[in-house]
Amino acid sequence: MNINIASHLQGPQRIVCLTEETTEWLYLLGQESRIVGISGYTVRPAKARQEKPKVSAFLSAKIDKILALKPDCVFGFSDLQADIAAELIRKGVQVTVFNQRSVSEIFSMLYQVAAMVGQAAQGLEKIAVMQTDLQAMAEAVSVRVANGARRPKVFFEEWDVPHISAIRWVSELMGIAGGDDCFPELALEPMGKQRIIADGAEIVRRDPDIIFGSWCGKKFRPENVAARLGWADVAAVKNQQLFEIKSPDILQPGPAALTDGVKKMHAFIIAWMDADQRSRAIA
């Protein structure tokens, strides 16, 4: 029996990614040739949808199709994919499930994946660029605040019925972008059901200046939010500060959230800061 030991020293060669963030990261590392299957929800990068077989949703997977691809590693995310992982493990497949919930944990995941495919040095370089950009953003916000700008209160709605508030990495990125999460205590809860706001009146009471909607892939409808009973006097509604952040840009705990997602929140927040500062100067 011939065994190519050297090939195993270069990390997994046939990877299935059950969520988008590992797919995007492997493409950014120039390691897309290792990917043999992806999630059907993958939109980043766009060419992945054209090049790679789709083998899973988020909560379900085509196990037979995955096995037919003969993967030597499957990347998954969170307890929500535990059943998929368990079934693949019982079939003899190597499965690595990440469970990142914070910005620092996302960076840790990125480094681990890079190291697994022999790209630790390149991974660290790309991570350093992202960290530098986030630090620069936070410092720019600090300068604005020192010059009289006010940080807006922000409600990030991850789902509409029931209301679900921001997961931890979104809340942290919101803070870097210049906003203050209206529900910081809920951001620490890892599970969506623990971040349900049963009484929408509590959102009204906290009176957010900005509302971001990212309804897990469902189109955000600002007009529906504005029409909610009792919401007419919420600052964000009165001032038409209701904006969509596309789910692939912010709810995938990987490169997208750390770059495009946080930048989009930052742009809306800075525009609000400038308008708020002008209105207070006139008053």
Protein language model features and the residues they cover:
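N-terminal ligand-binding lobe of clamshell/alpha-beta domains
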Residues: 1-283
